[in-house]
Amino acid sequence: MLTMIDEVYKIADKNEVILKANMKISGNVNCLLFANYCDSTVFYKDFFKVSKDILRVNKMVRRNLKEIKKVIKDNGYKKVWTRGVFSVYGDLRPLAVEANFGEWGDNGIIKNEKYGSDFLISAIFYK
């Protein structure tokens, strides 16, 4: 029998997640953190390619968060909320560093050994 986290990670793998973490943050709030690959070419160098890539990744992230949110609710958690690629409610970078997704770069971007800064972060919080 799969545990909830195993099931979540299986869904994440299906949705092309490259980095994932499960952590307890404050009190009884848990956090599942995900990173999806997205080329970090600057916008002005190839605006249309970058925009297309970001929108494609955003679609994958939304599908991933939706499927995983259902699994978490099915496991009895009542309060579940998500933060996607375009979330304006909070900065996920400190959580990404805490989850060992990478280290802070000089310009405030998280850099991973394998992927560099070529990823976008999303999260699900639940209690």
Question: Where are the language model's segments positioned?
Answer:
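Auxiliary alpha/beta "docking" domains used to position bulky ligands
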Residues: 1-127
